[in-house]
Amino acid sequence: GTLTRKGRLFNPSVSPDGTMLAAVEYPVTGGSAIVILNPATGKVLRRRQMPDSLQAVEPRFMGNALIFNAISEGGSAIYRINAGLDGEPECLLGPVKVSIRNLNPVNDKVYFSSDRDGTQELYSINTESRKVFQHTSLPYGGDEFCFIGQDVIFSMLTKDGRLLHKAPALEMSGKEVDFNDIHQYRVADKLTMQERAFAALKCI
């Protein structure tokens, strides 16, 4: 049934112990907020309004904190705030004028996908050292990376269409990168990649 009766809530995330539900609220008046709800009743327990210059997107629980990505005039970034939603959000990465999405906290890292090098690839940031690693470099990129046990499932464009692939997580240990070093011709190269992919699809 319906858990909440009003509001515009998106991208829900459940805490590891199942006692809290986080979501992003986009009020009709504008702006954005992160809200913590009771997952059984839908009652709002806490609410944190974001600055007008920051649009929160995906909140994810990580220990006693919330990790969330946000968009501002400077680009995309990853922030951390305690689950009590008090204190100031701490910027872990960015802002950078690339996409950052599909956050997935695992132990002391946050995995995410980004088009930093021209195609969507899997990255991670160590929340303590702030080191960033690139874990994939696929011909046409990949997306919707999902960790299941010791494997990673993801969607990848091939000549046979957009297919799901599985790979051992250990094979994606990654290389450290400077996330601010953006592909100079990112947009043009991405369009070229897409054109090649569509051309390959037409040839089969």
Predicted regions and their residues:
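Conserved beta-propeller blade repeats
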Residues: 6-25, 48-69, 90-113, 134-153
